[in-house]
Amino acid sequence: FYNVRANGKTNEEELFANLEPFFEALNLVRFEYVEKDIDLDKVIQGAIRGMLKALDDPYTRYMDPQALKREQEDMFLGRFGGLGIIISIKDDQLTIISPIEDTPAYRAGIKAGDRIVEIDGKTTEGMGLDEAVNILRGDKGTEVTLGIKRENIEELLEITIIRDIIEIKAVKKEIMGKDDNIGYVRITTFNINTEPELEEVLNEFKKDSDIQGIILDLRNNPGGLLDSAIEVASKFIKDGPVVHIKDRDGIVASIESRGNKYPEWPLFVLINEGSASASEIVAGAVQDSGRGKLLGEKTFGKGVVQQVFNLYDGSGIAITTSEYFTPSERSINHIGIEPDILVEPAEDSEQDMQLNKAIQFLEE
């Protein structure tokens, strides 16, 4: 059960008094509404969604049993049918946090920060996150047309994308540089596989005595599990705080690095507007500790942590339970993290200017 706190103590009588108008309204619907055969589960779910929407927090949301199961499978299996985009609600608009690399959306030119204003000609105004995800998901080979508003472009962009099976590999690696001495690591998401996959890659780099520097690519990484972010940051930061987390009572917990066993290679971290949440924890820790340099563009600005609570019927509620701050106690939420070295992508070139710049710095 849940205790309800009022003025620092449990006050169930006050809670039930506040709920009386709700039960009155529910009974009026049950016994006075013109259609007798109403779907009571649907009505209750709508009431829960309305309650959470009143908090004006895009990250606190209700998930019906199907949506909760889907989210858990996405996080732990990393495989689903869809377009390959991570979306959220930002400024009351359906917003793409990031396209997932090597997916239909990525290949179609979808960009972080794009606003989805239409799906198959239907406006997304007032559309909830779960409703949008349900529409965008689908079988391989089916198509959907998105109406996109993009910054600095007046006209509506209509982009048709064919759905596919999206499989997310958390960590990718490559050896780069003219002397093959730069280790490139791309982290696409923070899930239960990220830390062991990164460990394997860094062990390979450690055995290769030629490696003289590391590029950690967090661009278009929308985040994921908090613990995974702490593990990743700890691979590069030997000691000291990785992140501070403040709860509703103002109590701050400082989470320290879990220590690292790797050489302190020169480090560049690539970031952009699609780097969010757990990515910002890692980027902030690297920047504040002085362990490396951030290169690219300002990050998304999601500095809050959600916890999922299961309800008895198999549904769940994701509730924002705390806010996080960088080791130097900077707030990130709605602000983002500025790079140490600003490098904007070349719009009219296939060259990866940010990656090339990081390689150039490491080769100097």
Give, region by region, the residue ranges found by the protein language model.
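Terminal targeting/pro-maturation regions of precursor/exported proteins
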Residues: F1-Y59, D208-S209
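Extended, small/polar residue-biased N-terminal targeting/export presequences
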Residues: R30-T95, E143-T145, K149-T160, E167-K173
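Glycine-rich active-site/cofactor-binding loop and its immediate structural neighborhood
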Residues: L77-I119
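Cleft-lining beta-strand/loop regions that shape enzyme active-site pockets
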Residues: T95-S98, Y106-A112, D120-T123, G128-K302, ...
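Short acidic, Pro/Gly- and aromatic-enriched capping/linker segments at domain boundaries
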Residues: D313, A318-S322
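Conserved functional hotspot residues or short segments at active or partner-binding sites
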Residues: I332, D348, M353-E364
